[in-house]
């Protein structure tokens, strides 16, 4: 359930990979 997570965190996770 990552709908409440902002896109900044998702982008950081994607760029963190």
From Swiss-Prot:
Keywords: Cytoplasm, Elongation factor, GTP-binding, Nucleotide-binding, Protein biosynthesis
Gene Ontology cellular component terms for the protein in this record: cytoplasm
Superkingdom of the organism of origin: Bacteria
Protein location: Cytoplasm
Transmembrane feature ranges: none
Function: Catalyzes the GTP-dependent ribosomal translocation step during translation elongation. During this step, the ribosome changes from the pre-translocational (PRE) to the post-translocational (POST) state as the newly formed A-site-bound peptidyl-tRNA and P-site-bound deacylated tRNA move to the P and E sites, respectively. Catalyzes the coordinated movement of the two tRNA molecules, the mRNA and conformational changes in the ribosome.
Family: Belongs to the GTP-binding elongation factor family. EF-G/EF-2 subfamily.
Stated name of the protein: Elongation factor G
Organism in which the protein naturally occurs: Thermus aquaticus
């Amino acid at each position: 359930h990552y709908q409440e997570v902002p896109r900044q965190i998702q982008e950081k996770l994607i760029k963190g990979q």
